[in-house]
Amino acid sequence: MYLSFYGLRKQPFHVTPDPEFLYLSPSHEKALAAITHGVEERKGFIAVTGDVGVGKTTILRWYLHLKKREPLKTVYVFNARLTFEQLLRTIYRELDFRIAGNSVTEMVERLYEFLIEESRQGNTVVLLIDEAQNMSDDTLESLAMMSKGETSKDKLLQIVLVGQPEFKRALNTDRLRQLKQQLAAHATIRRLSRGESLEYLRFRLKHAGGDPTSVFTTPALKKIVRKSKGIPRVLNVLCDNALITGFYRRQKPVTERITKEVIRTYGGRSSFFRRQLPLAVLAPVLFFLGITSFLRVKRMRSAEQRGPGHREEIKQDEAIGE
């Protein structure tokens, strides 16, 4: 929509995780290193935690991208609301492995046999579980018991658990004490500092083919950085909507005035935004609002070209819709 206007080749601020635009802060680097080292050394359990929108899923996808040519067999679970049996069936399905028996015990025993054979052949099997805070304690306990399978040197199944802060709190409960004791590494992805946030935005704009100074003024970027509180997903949402608004206004670069308007419209006074609902839900709403704004501006411009009578028709239509 606004790419050619701002001299961009790609959309710089997709809300969905995109490894192509990966920006690694020090805490992101540590999380990636924890996963990489833990899996390579066959340590067993690795945990990564962090707030909503800080880039946990992006790190997982980048890890998979880096390792796609290595002898890894990966199972990526993005819906963690599973019973232990459902999790086992998911593992079997993703490994293209025929389910043995109907009982959980039979499935675990057959899976052990499979893992031992893979280990003998020099292959590593990795289970990646995103949104681990949604997994029940029963399933996590069973997973901890199952992961005890090992050779004389290594764990047979490498398990990476990625979740929000509530998952970290759950690990500190008595019930999941056994699981916590099995963790070989636990990394926390932190929010970006203001300096890192500015660097993040400029990095993405450059990677999209643009000159940051010709797309946003520095005060405009700083305003967005302050509002985002260091959460990359919020940075993306606000910047994308600022670009949409700037495009409709034919304003280049995007000014602080436009970013203030975007923040006020989508975040500043709205309790909806302040409650910090998951932005996976919020983003489509913002997109809809942006499109609505675009259509309204387009209609008004068209009406101005046609004359006063058409402008009056649009005002009547809007009054009916309110």
What are these regions (language model features)?
Residues 10-13, 72, 83-101:
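Conserved NTP-binding/hydrolysis module of P-loop NTPases
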Residues 78, 184-196:
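Conserved AAA+ ATPase "SRH/arginine-finger" region at the nucleotide-binding site
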Residues 93-95, 165-166, 174, 195-211:
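Conserved AAA+ ATPase "sensor/coupling" helix adjacent to the nucleotide-binding pocket
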